[in-house]
């Protein structure tokens, strides 16, 4: 698995991936269903963020992650992920509008062909973009989008 730590300077040979996007802080069954929907004709990638946005916005909060970035990368590699885009969640990324995130990061930067997110996915400054917004913005730029239904475990969404 190739690891990429920014959305800029991505090699042309890496562009065109089909990605699952989210925090994947535990890589549980719900995450795996999102990843499975991203599998297809294009190489499989993951777009995730480090640190977790919650750690960026509330660094004083107690630790909550089920696995650190290294354990997450190892788990994703075992699931057959070919490209891990572990984007730096910093003030620059946090300030992007949903439109700028799709245009600058997903389209111009990573050059993805397909993105899959969970139905509860939020993105952009102030979490102002929804999964539906992502689909609308991506489709306008030629990026196929799939919104995965939430997975339940004993009646509880995970």
List PLM regions with ranges.
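Nucleotidyltransferase catalytic core that binds NTPs
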Residues: 1-158
